[in-house]
């Protein structure tokens, strides 16, 4: 009986830790000054749920202490329009690591959310692959591009090197933001 309890406990602990998000290595070519000058991007692909992530746009502006990003969501779920804005403020580099930083996001209602992020790949102009991790639970990886349609060759190269299949991710192509079915 003790063995069954021990194995069950170990299984629960393993599952709990498997769901924890761990930041991946950031892009070596990350340049904060240039990266945070990209004014407007679309989330074109999302690895995990919620699929509504691909219906978002990011508008970033520099501030004295870092940057502020306004994330705008525009989509319809079963005919019901959802339009909201979340303001995220960069609170600095994570452990001094270039390409990794902490952000505090304030949704329209409710408490602020703190995330740690890692820019996995970028050309600092047209695209970025951004990993975001909440303080607990599973994170997500997003493809951000200045072009609403298509896939930048740099994104394709990164996915190929990682052995990832972009066609298996949620995208603006396979998620209809005007009529999302739950």
UniProtKB/Swiss-Prot annotation:
Keyword set, alphabetical order: Disulfide bond, Hemostasis impairing toxin, Platelet aggregation inhibiting toxin, Secreted, Signal, Toxin
Signal peptide range in chain numbering: 1-18
GO molecular function: toxin activity
Annotated GO CC locations: extracellular region
Cell compartment(s), UniProt: Secreted
Cysteines joined through disulfide linkages: 21-133, 55-177, 88-105
Gene3D superfamilies: 2.40.128.20
GO biological process, one term: symbiont-mediated perturbation of host defenses
Source organism phylogeny: Eukaryota, Metazoa, Ecdysozoa, Arthropoda, Hexapoda
Keyword hit for Disulfide bond: yes
Cited SUPFAM superfamilies: Lipocalins
Pfam families referenced in this protein's UniProt entry, alphabetically: Triabin (PF03973)
Described purpose of this protein according to its UniProt entry: Inhibits platelet aggregation and vasoconstriction through binding to distinct eicosanoids involved in inflammation (acts as a scavenger), and has a role in inhibiting host innate immunity by impairing platelet-assisted formation of neutrophil extracellular traps (NETs). Inhibits platelet aggregation by collagen, and low doses of thromboxane A2 mimetic (TXA2 mimetic), and arachidonic acid (AA) without affecting aggregation induced by ADP, convulxin (GP6 agonist), and PMA. Binds to TXA2, TXB2, prostaglandine H2 mimetic (PGH2 mimetic), PGJ2, and PGF2alpha.
Record's protein name: Triplatin
Tissue and organ distribution: Expressed in salivary glands.
Keyword Disulfide bond appears in the UniProt entry: yes
Family designation: Belongs to the calycin superfamily. Triabin family.
